[in-house]
Amino acid sequence: MVKKIHFIMERHASIVAFLLAVLALTESQAFTSVKLPRDEHWPYNYVSIGPAGVWAVNRQNKLFYRTGTYGDNANMGSGWQFKQDGVGQVDVGKDKVGYINLSGGSLFRIDGISQGNPVGGSPKSWEWWTKYIGMSLREDTRFSSRIENQNKVLTFTFRTCFWASRITNWCFADSSYTETVTAGGSGTWITKSQLKYKSGTFGNPDTEGGDWITVDSGSFQHVSSGSGVVLAVRSNGELVKRTGITCSLPQGSGWTSMLNGMSRVDTYGTVAWAVDTYGDLYFINL
């Protein structure tokens, strides 16, 4: 009888272990991706998704809005509407889009985006000497972040700071070499070859937070913070998803590999968009 009980317990334990392994494997592979057909605007350099829809920049530095994606992040859209020439990088916020002017390194903002006018009004000059913009997903753009031309992270806050011999609301958040910055539901993250998370920003990225925590000392080229998810692109082009992210461990504990040959990624809600090294676009259901 004792042997029989032990056998049953061992059998149940092995079944449970098997089911847990299957569940873990399923979770690690629980995404689907669609590679968009090449169109007349191909190849692309950047893509961004947010409340104001999907926007992309091609290698001719033209900025486009993806038709049918405003307020509907799960929609892949059906075509592109041209918006602006001479654009280097774009990031989507809430009814606003920020982009970098390629020639002058100046930051511009497109306001007035709505369901009835998804491409918004005329671009407005916002700031000088900018190489990267991370827009706030709130209506208030003062919670956005940017990287200036000396590779330093600045956050747009309510405080007034003295910077570059003039008064501004852009305040230093990190003083060393930075490549990309992102702010979303999983907090504020940056790539500095290494990957770093700003403590105290999980669930509320619109705060200045605390110290920077090195999450991975490996080499990364891009990162995107979403709601409970962080996606990143390693320098070798591998798109990875951060695992183990919780309120008590916001920097997570590991990685799951997703796709190879990528250069950029952006996530919002339950989906993500990515660009590969050939300039092809990918729509990803997470």
From Swiss-Prot:
Pfam families: Tectonin. Glycosylated. PV2 contains four O-linked and one N-linked oligosaccharide bonds. The protein contains 2.5% of carbohydrates (high levels of mannose, galactose, and NAcGlucosamine, and small amounts of NacGalactosamine). Keywords: Disulfide bond, Enterotoxin, Glycoprotein, Hemagglutinin, Lectin, Lipoprotein, Membrane, Neurotoxin, Secreted, Signal, Storage protein, Target cell membrane, Target membrane, Toxin. Residues 1-30 form the signal peptide. One of its GO terms (molecular function) is nutrient reservoir activity. GO terms for cellular component: extracellular region; membrane; other organism cell membrane. Glycans are attached at N101. InterPro entries: Beta-propeller_rpt_TECPR, Tectonin_beta-propeller. It is found in: Secreted; Target cell membrane. Produced by albumen secretory cells. Found in developing eggs. It comes from the Eukaryota. The egg defensive protein perivitellin-2 is a pore-forming two-subunit glycoprotein that affects both the nervous and digestive systems of mammals. In addition, it is a source of both structural and energetic molecules during embryonic development. The tachylectin subunit (31 kDa) binds target membranes while the MACPF subunit (67 kDa) disrupts lipid bilayers forming large pores altering the plasma membrance conductance. Both in vivo and in vitro, the protein shows wide pH range stability and is resistant to enzymatic proteolysis from gastrointestinal environments. Belongs to the tectonin family. Perivitellin-2 is a heterooctamer of 4 identical 98 kDa heterodimers, each composed of one 31 kDa and one 67 kDa subunits. The 98 kDa heterodimer subunits are held together by disulfide bridges while the heterodimers are assembled into the native perivitellin-2 octamer by non-covalent forces. PANTHER family: DYSFERLIN-RELATED, FISH-EGG LECTIN-LIKE ISOFORM X1-RELATED. This is Perivitellin-2 31 kDa subunit.
